[in-house]
Amino acid sequence: MLKIKALFSKKKPDQADLSQESKKPFKGKTRSSGTNNKDVSQITSSPKKSFQDKNIVQYPSVVADDHHMKSLTDELVTTIDSDSSPSDNITTENVETVTSVPAIDVHESSEGQLSSDPLISDESLSEQSEIISDIQDDSTDDDNMEDEIPEKSFLEQKELIGYKLINKIGEGAFSKVFRAIPAKNSSNEFLTKNYKAVAIKVIKKADLSSINGDHRKKDKGKDSTKTSSRDQVLKEVALHKTVSAGCSQIVAFIDFQETDSYYYIIQELLTGGEIFGEIVRLTYFSEDLSRHVIKQLALAVKHMHSLGVVHRDIKPENLLFEPIEFTRSIKPKLRKSDDPQTKADEGIFTPGVGGGGIGIVKLADFGLSKQIFSKNTKTPCGTVGYTAPEVVKDEHYSMKVDMWGIGCVLYTMLCGFPPFYDEKIDTLTEKISRGEYTFLKPWWDEISAGAKNAVAKLLELEPSKRYDIDQFLDDPWLNTFDCLPKEGESSQKKAGTSERRHPHKKQFQLFQRDSSLLFSPAAVAMRDAFDIGNAVKRTEEDRMGTRGGLGSLAEDEELEDSYSGAQGDEQLEQNMFQLTLDTSTILQRRKKVQENDVGPTIPISATIRE
């Protein structure tokens, strides 16, 4: 059993400390649908827009040449796993719908469209206009991207059609993720016009066949009807294609290719990276920035639920974002629990645009998603720590599971650490089953009653009493902004709290982020607090023969990655650092670990789904 040691100072030992982090900005992290990433140069993969419910760019979900998917999805109709319950299946009707989704006309939304939100002041609109202008000016930086030279020759390039692999940006247990650009000779004008760069997840068939063969050996003598790895890949592709069509808060599905040796899943490339990394960098989010992120997540979930699809693995690692220009605060607002020497400035927040460098936010990773329609589903999945009580207790559950996940993400953004934590997995799952969390002092002392109420409604133990997606979107707290002048308050007072920077285009690389921050001991421990527990839980389910359905393949992979090359428990314990809820920073703790020469930190487990 993997363990994470914890020390707690004067506070309940319920929560992992992710407050008071040293804030070194990091370089262009890029991620596609969940993966470990290497530094890549900042690029623009899609037009950047202000975020609004109505005036939002509708990213194209399907390229014009749909012949790659046609034969595969036709075949999928007859290859859906027979062992799944009716709720597991993607019906013939739905698969046909997937293949016929038209490409979205990106010209329907103009480049300079501004927010029509009545909550936004004239000053905010003016600033929003300036930011959009800056973004448009910067877009020319990518004009010569097709001339980029790959950093090396990749074996995966040989069978890939229409794209040029530039560099590897991530790697999972059975896949690699590449940044790529459309080939110069591509006949697909829609693709080359609307996507300067893409992310391609490459899955090697031989690796999947090997892991499925191992499972068959384990299940020998049992009535096993596990679907083939190919079926599982096609299911994930079909669901991703379905849910991303027409929703700008979901990472766009672009293309899919199958060759003799590989599966290629081509999808939108977001240059900001994971929201998880921003929580680590900023320690926590202001209520305004938390609203900005969580509302976009809620809109993505609303779209999925309207299609009868439940995500089942909502967490900060599965939220990606497009960066915006950072505007420094003249007098950063600090909480009493903050250390002014280490708390990073979140900067000015602009309603409808964002803040802290975070603009448009999108939901990724559909490896555990399931189409349930109006029926309940009973396949335990997700990440322990963000998993709803009814899932932990192996009860029937439906779309309210995603609302629990939204609540955990909101809690984490507001204070910097998750609502449920314990060094022992069995204790953690018991806490989740009982809904045992607290608004821990002093971190929650200055968070508004409205925010606490929203979290409480989302983390309601009884699913029937828990917010549904429409109730959450109507919550009063979600539909206000602290940065806007209150009634009778001068707008000049608010405008004077920050100063805007107008950097040269080449300085529009935002924060020059330091990727090492994401591999610091505290960040690793935060991920492992959820991912390791989830992997252990799924291992137990696998022994009982209860796993299956759409998420099976993803579960195999995450389990493999979480153990980081099958290190022994003893070695893992030596590499882990001690969590503490004091004011020490991530980098200070990391320095102590290095000075003690306890060995390298555990690599962050890959969250990409294969």
UniProtKB/Swiss-Prot annotation:
<dbReference type="GO" id="GO:0040020">
    <property type="term" value="P:regulation of meiotic nuclear division"/>
</dbReference>
<feature type="modified residue" description="Phosphoserine">
    <location>
        <position position="520"/>
    </location>
</feature>
<dbReference type="GO" id="GO:0005516">
    <property type="term" value="F:calmodulin binding"/>
</dbReference>
<dbReference type="InterPro" id="IPR017441">
    <property type="entry name" value="Protein_kinase_ATP_BS"/>
</dbReference>
<dbReference type="GO" id="GO:0034599">
    <property type="term" value="P:cellular response to oxidative stress"/>
</dbReference>
<dbReference type="GO" id="GO:0007165">
    <property type="term" value="P:signal transduction"/>
</dbReference>
<dbReference type="GO" id="GO:0106310">
    <property type="term" value="F:protein serine kinase activity"/>
</dbReference>
<dbReference type="GO" id="GO:0007231">
    <property type="term" value="P:osmosensory signaling pathway"/>
</dbReference>
<dbReference type="InterPro" id="IPR008271">
    <property type="entry name" value="Ser/Thr_kinase_AS"/>
</dbReference>
<dbReference type="GO" id="GO:0004672">
    <property type="term" value="F:protein kinase activity"/>
</dbReference>
<keyword id="KW-0723">Serine/threonine-protein kinase</keyword>
<feature type="compositionally biased region" description="Basic and acidic residues">
    <location>
        <begin position="11"/>
        <end position="24"/>
    </location>
</feature>
<feature type="region of interest" description="Disordered">
    <location>
        <begin position="99"/>
        <end position="127"/>
    </location>
</feature>
<keyword id="KW-0597">Phosphoprotein</keyword>
<dbReference type="InterPro" id="IPR011009">
    <property type="entry name" value="Kinase-like_dom_sf"/>
</dbReference>
<dbReference type="InterPro" id="IPR000719">
    <property type="entry name" value="Prot_kinase_dom"/>
</dbReference>
<keyword id="KW-0963">Cytoplasm</keyword>
<dbReference type="GO" id="GO:0004674">
    <property type="term" value="F:protein serine/threonine kinase activity"/>
</dbReference>
<protein>
    <recommendedName>
        <fullName>Serine/threonine-protein kinase RCK2</fullName>
        <ecNumber>2.7.11.1</ecNumber>
    </recommendedName>
</protein>
<feature type="modified residue" description="Phosphoserine">
    <location>
        <position position="187"/>
    </location>
</feature>
<feature type="binding site">
    <location>
        <position position="201"/>
    </location>
    <ligand>
        <name>ATP</name>
    </ligand>
</feature>
<feature type="modified residue" description="Phosphoserine">
    <location>
        <position position="46"/>
    </location>
</feature>
<keyword id="KW-0418">Kinase</keyword>
<dbReference type="GO" id="GO:0005737">
    <property type="term" value="C:cytoplasm"/>
</dbReference>
<comment type="function">
    <text>Serine/threonine-protein kinase involved in a signal transduction pathway that is activated by changes in the osmolarity of the extracellular environment.</text>
</comment>
<feature type="domain" description="Protein kinase">
    <location>
        <begin position="163"/>
        <end position="478"/>
    </location>
</feature>
<comment type="similarity">
    <text>Belongs to the protein kinase superfamily. CAMK Ser/Thr protein kinase family. CaMK subfamily.</text>
</comment>
<keyword id="KW-0808">Transferase</keyword>
<dbReference type="Pfam" id="PF00069">
    <property type="entry name" value="Pkinase"/>
</dbReference>
<keyword id="KW-0112">Calmodulin-binding</keyword>
<feature type="modified residue" description="Phosphoserine">
    <location>
        <position position="50"/>
    </location>
</feature>
<dbReference type="GO" id="GO:0005524">
    <property type="term" value="F:ATP binding"/>
</dbReference>
<feature type="active site" description="Proton acceptor">
    <location>
        <position position="313"/>
    </location>
</feature>
<feature type="modified residue" description="Phosphothreonine">
    <location>
        <position position="350"/>
    </location>
</feature>
<feature type="compositionally biased region" description="Polar residues">
    <location>
        <begin position="31"/>
        <end position="55"/>
    </location>
</feature>
<feature type="region of interest" description="Disordered">
    <location>
        <begin position="541"/>
        <end position="564"/>
    </location>
</feature>
<keyword id="KW-0067">ATP-binding</keyword>
<feature type="region of interest" description="Calmodulin-binding">
    <location>
        <begin position="493"/>
        <end position="506"/>
    </location>
</feature>
<feature type="binding site">
    <location>
        <begin position="169"/>
        <end position="177"/>
    </location>
    <ligand>
        <name>ATP</name>
    </ligand>
</feature>
<feature type="region of interest" description="Disordered">
    <location>
        <begin position="1"/>
        <end position="55"/>
    </location>
</feature>
<keyword id="KW-0547">Nucleotide-binding</keyword>
